Design a protein with these regions (language model features):
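Short basic (Lys/Arg) and small-residue
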Residues: 134
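Residue-level preference for the first positions of well-ordered beta-strands
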Residues: 4-6, 32-34, 81-84, 109-111
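Conserved RecA-like ASCE ATPase "motif II neighborhood" in helicase/translocase motors
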Residues: 59-84, 92-96
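Sensor-1/coupling segment of RecA-like P-loop NTPase cores
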Residues: 103-126
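Conserved P-loop
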Residues: 1-73, 118-129, 142, 170-173, ...
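Conserved ATPase-coupling elements of RecA-like P-loop NTPase cores
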Residues: 88-99, 119-124
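Walker B catalytic acidic pair
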Residues: 86-88, 114-115
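Short recognition patches in nucleic-acid-associated and regulatory proteins
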Residues: 142-175
Length: 214
């Protein structure tokens, strides 16, 4: 029986790497599928991992009807055994509904990968809907680490080295062009206390920030 499975974690927990590995495993067994993504750090229409791996993908625009897209390809005779959905936190809730329809109505496995919450600790709408609908929600086992060495559970946004907890999910317009925006992962204790790596003089802040958007 087909399933909708959501793999989630913080930044640096290997979500896109696992998405690419999952696609590779299916392809190596002769299975054919589709890969979707949204706002990948490497640009439009590509899924990339921090390890340097990447693959072409279908960009999920806000108005894309994923279910209709898949049905049309099946109607043209295309074979689709599985679907990979990276950066699923950025999908619209109705697009997540479409993924569930693909699983239940078409019998196609859907593997979604994403981040649960934004820098304000608020669930992304796409992730919230996946938690509500997925057959399984799996937390990634590769643990990202806070600067203190503890397991990182929260994503933090910093502006000029100072952690911010307010503002829109859309980065553009939040700050001026001269401001330095970055993201890093923190344990809950240091996220609540707003103690970043720079503030603690402890070291690394991610040099490859993700574009947290609605």
């Amino acid at each position: 029986m087909a399933e909708l499975i959501y793999y989630c974690g913080t930044m640096d927990s290997g979500k896109s790497t696992l998405a690419l590995q999952t696609a590779h495993n299916h392809k190596s067994r002769g299975r054919t599928g589709l890969i979707f993504t949204n706002k990948d750090r490497a640009g439009t229409g590509v899924i990339s991992s921090r390890l340097g791996l990447q693959s072409e993908a279908i960009e999920v625009e806000p108005d894309l009807d994923i279910h209709k897209f898949v049905v049309e390809h099946l109607s043209m005779g295309d074979r689709i055994d599985y679907i990979i959905c990276d950066e699923a936190q950025f999908y619209q809730p109705d697009q997540i509904d479409g993924l569930a329809k693909i699983v239940d109505g078409l019998g196609i496995d859907v593997y979604a990968f994403g981040i649960l919450a934004d820098f304000r600790t608020k669930l992304f709408p796409g992730s919230a809907r996946l938690v509500e609908l997925a057959d399984r929600v799996n937390t990634l086992q590769v643990e990202a680490l806070c600067w203190c060495g503890s397991r990182a559970t929260h994503n933090a946004r910093t502006v000029n080295g100072v952690m911010v907890t307010e503002g829109e999910q859309v980065v553009v317009g939040d700050v001026g062009k001269s401001d330095e925006i970055a993201y890093e992962v923190l344990c809950r204790r240091h996220h609540m206390r707003q103690v970043t790596a720079r503030a603690s003089r402890a070291g690394h802040i991610s040099s490859d920030p993700l574009p947290f958007t609605e």
